[in-house]
Amino acid sequence: MKQFASAGRIATRAFTLIELLVVIAIIAIIAAMLIPALSKAKIRAQRLTCMNHTKQLTLAWLIYASDNNERTLNTVDWMSVDVGNPSNDQFIDFNKELVKQPLNPYLAGNVAVYKCPADPRKSTKAGYVGTPCCRSLTMNIYFGYETWTPGYLIYYKTSDLTRPGPVNTFVFLDEGLSINNGMFGTDMDTYDPNDMANKHTTDVPAPYHDNAGSFSFADGHSEIHKWRDRRTALTTGWPWSSPNNVDIDWVQSKSSAKSLRPTR
């Protein structure tokens, strides 16, 4: 004799299926709400890590100066790079060289500080395709590079940092796609806050932190600076001309100051 399920049991099973669908829908809604929050949390964590990296590098740089009669490690010597090497020019197999750099003894061998954790760059060169770069930080070219922009201060010692002052002179930053050697070249010959029409510079800063970049300063502090001109984050070529770009003006204002001595 065939047995039939009771109406009550069928109703219970149908209700359980509906409950399951409701739970799935709720989970989907919660996930949709959490994913942006998790993304923002990741951005914040990367910012903090990058600021910590630039701060560690700058403190090492300051201790180096203290050990050498205030003489700072300059923009040429702080990072020995053979830019002709097809791998080194994108710093993709450079870890073995990072441990040899002059600041490394002050960093306890922690080569991770040379890279921004948000730097997504990977090599496209034959033999290295897909290999992540291992360095994204460069130094302000006005630390020791004598022939860059005539008429502007070059800093050799910490005591030279009179203008714009240690708190307003950057040492390290995240460099963008223009990265090659250890220097970040800012052209001061177009620096005039009253004339923004001819803004031009050599190297480009990175936008790795949600359209912002990490900077450290000669007083030892680090900060994340938000770019205000959308062209800054979209720049793929260099040297870089960008009329009326307030971001170039800001970087220039933190790079050097007009020398009070007459140029020869």
Language model features by range: what are they?
Residues 6, 14, 73-77:
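Short hydrophobic/aromatic-rich motifs at helix boundaries and adjacent loops
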Residues 48-264:
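Short, well-structured segments within or immediately adjacent to enzyme catalytic domains
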Residues 7, 11-52:
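Amphipathic alpha-helical segments typified by the pilin-like N-terminal helix
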Residues 1-2:
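N-terminal hydrophobic targeting signals that begin at the initiator methionine
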